[in-house]
């Protein structure tokens, strides 16, 4: 009879059932709150040619100078290329993905958290356990793998209760 608490930001009905089953919970109290975060603003942009999407992203970031943001991509190559294009346009950005050695990943994460860089361009390898309350925007360069991933990743914006912008290409 050891008390157990299980917490998650997002869980489908199946995941909730699995948690109850695998933790051996009997008649658990389950509390669910709304997915709605009134401080987050969602926008969908049509996917155009790569150079046009990059121009749109650069323009948006330039209009949000000094504000931290995360750009999610689906693969390492795109992450590296996009970070390089942002740097070439005068934006302090770094790439983050599982292919980097752990020391470099830690350094880049610390640079982002310490505001040495404005933007981190990342695969889904970035984010779990990251709590930077003042992320003002999350951009998805590619469609996320699932709606749950999208919600989880956009939820990194505006954790301080202030406005966050979520843009999907």
Residue ranges and their predicted role:
Residues 1-169:
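Helicase motor core with emphasis on the C-terminal RecA-like subdomain
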